[in-house]
Amino acid sequence: MIMQPVSRRDWLRLSGLALASLSIQHKVSANIQLPEQTLNTISGNPLARLSSNENPYGPSEKVRKAIMDNMDVVCRYPFSYQDELLQAIADWEGVSKDHIVLTAGSTEGLKITGLTLGWKGGEIVAPDPTFNSLMVYAEQFGANIHKIPVTATLDHDLTGMAAKINGNTKLVFVCNPNNPTGTLIPANDLKAFCKQAAEKTTVFVDEAYFDFITTPDYPSMVNLVKQGLNVIVSRTFSKVYGLAGLRMGYLVANPAIASKLIDNRVAFVGTLGMVAAREALSDKAFYAFSLLKNKEAKEHIYETLDSLGLVYMPSHTNFVFFKPKRELGAFNKELEKWGVQAGRPFPPLIDWSRISTGTMAEMQQFRAAMLKIYG
């Protein structure tokens, strides 16, 4: 049961690549053969791990080969290998290299921003719930967090967030699409909000799930960085590129801000992670394959939830947020009993559950578990 309508047109966003027909989509899927059961056996875990919004098909074969071909340089520190990746990302985003901050996953980017701007009493405005690594880390260094509840439709309350900005506000945090709700802010609303807020403070836009957006021509807020606005954007290689275990991400910010963030990095990213990220950016076929498989898996989740009459949010990500109509702790235990691991609770929405997309085998495992629970 869909909570609100969603467009499923133009499901594939690509830079320089579009899949023009269904036959081409099938060709892409057929030409890339990767293990279907990898996630079920990882670390000896027998569960279908649908809890962390990972890409079960990654990394691509080209990335795997690049990693193996560069094993000989693992004995060297990675300083001399950064420049090529920085340039590749800068070209991808359409900015100069001094706008880019390499981070160990987008999580490090979130944390160093929280440290840099939330230090000793800085105020941060954020939606609630959201992916809160930045806020949690900033609190450890004395930041004051103002949480603005999402609306009844689980959207960012941009009006409420704007009203909370004052002279002590050091950062406004936006997650778009939002984790865990999967909702997407209308492009014009987001641009207007960011422009207005950036006149008063720094705006951070977490775009970890940006690649999954299907709305035609939906803009990245990197465009505002290019205009010189006080905006920081985070991106990750952990989702569509399938590199979660290598911890690769980056920030895009104006050079003056980027320099301050670089000074607060805990360490530098590893050589093989940089090699993998550089190759992943150029592998458009795997990018398309991953988006196609995510679309198929998400539709399978929708069908399962619809058949059971469960309310869910149409998602612009690689997960679906739904109401199981049961106490979440007990529900998660029931799922695990039948071989499926779902996401953690997301207070204050403790009557909602987040399930990640997976392989079709895992989606069938999820459906079977749900039928056992609700049958």
PLM-predicted stretches and their roles:
Residues 230-313:
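PLP-dependent aminotransferase class I/II
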Residues 334-337, 346-375:
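PLP-dependent enzyme catalytic core of the Aspartate aminotransferase-like
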Residues 19-76:
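N-terminal "arm"/small-domain region of PLP-dependent enzymes with the aminotransferase-like
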Residues 116-174:
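PLP-dependent aminotransferase-like
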Residues 84-123, 137:
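Phosphate-binding glycine-rich loop
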Residues 158-167, 180-203, 207-238:
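Active-site pre-lysine segment of PLP-dependent enzymes
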Residues 1-30:
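N-terminal export signals
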